[in-house]
Amino acid sequence: EDEIATVIKDIDLTGVTLTPADSYAGTFNGNGHSLKNWTSDNTLFTTLAATGTVKDLIIDKSCTLSFPSDKQYFGFVVGNNAGTVSGVENYADVTIPALPTVANYYGTICGNNTATVADCANYGDITYSGSVPTQNACYGGVVGQITGAAAVAKNLFNIGDVTATINGVAAKSVYWNGVLGWLGSNGKLLDSVNQGNVTVTAHGNSQMLTACGLVSYAGGEVSGCYNGGNISYYAESAEGLADGGVQRTGVAGIAAYIGWSGKEVQNNINDGNITFRAGYSSGYAASGSFTKYAVNVAGVFAAVYNCGLNGCKNSGEINFTMTDIDNASSYDYKAVNNPARQSCGGVVASSWGKLTDCENTGDVNIIFTTVKPQEGVALSAWNGKGVGYQFGGISGGDYHSSQDKSPIEGCTNSGDIHIISNATAYNNNAGGI
């Protein structure tokens, strides 16, 4: 742990295969120098111990990087971090040849973090095009996962685009994010920025699927974060068809889910456009904090669970499209005697918690319709299968439909709300706030 290694010049790794350090407890100082011409699907440090530090290292854009498919936690610099990773930057593009064969948490810099990751950045694009996942998969532009009450990620920055094309219906959960894949209970993601576009295309999804600027799932604090990238999920078999079935889906500028239990997150801002396009809702889990509603789309947070928001703002345009809500495979709430709602809002889609001093200035554009029927052919008796909507300028609706749990104070909306819908059979709600 007393070892100090300092890089004194850029390192050309042409034709060199590096062997990862299994466990490192000393200090590795990149000293602002670069690794160049590194071709790798492996890490530098498999595990960084609590006394370990890796800092001030650059992965040059000349490197050729690809994520592996057989590791649970992976980053090109550190796989598992229990120490401190700071000042590390990646400029190389990353390809994903195949989705993982084990449930994974991947980031360009660090895979799993239980301590501190700070002042790190990714400038490279991350790209996947291929078959459906066989295991749950979670990707972050910088870090894969933050877990534990002592875990902190701060001043992280992503400018690279994350682009995923899944050729089929995703039957395993998959999460695509600009900065961080997953934030565990009581961890912290602070003062971090995404400027890259996150674009996901699939034929649909029968398990959780998220596209987010900062993080998919947050069980801890997310404060002072900013998204300027455009975030999109297209559930369709071909461009523009909007024919895919979806369930348990989150699309948002900051996070798909925030559940910092009983506490408040502050000052998160989205300026990117948010786009969701699909055919119909094919179902949802009847219980569970993330899965109450089939679809949640919002500028800042999609679903908020027992957590307050303060000073959160959206200026991006929100576009929510479903054009086949009466599909024969769509969700029928009568079958399980439990309602589902498609939710969309300028700041939050479905909330449980106090909203204070939040602001939306972006337009919210909704298309929620059946396929145009043939002349003389009536729509089904249960138009939309009972799947309704809740759309709003600040919040789509209260997660638990209880105003005393989710008051809204000092919030303003100046964005226009545009709704085109022919859903008739269920309780549909829309409002300026």
Task: Identify the residue ranges that each predicted region occupies.
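Surface-exposed repetitive/solenoidal architectures
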Residues: E1-I433
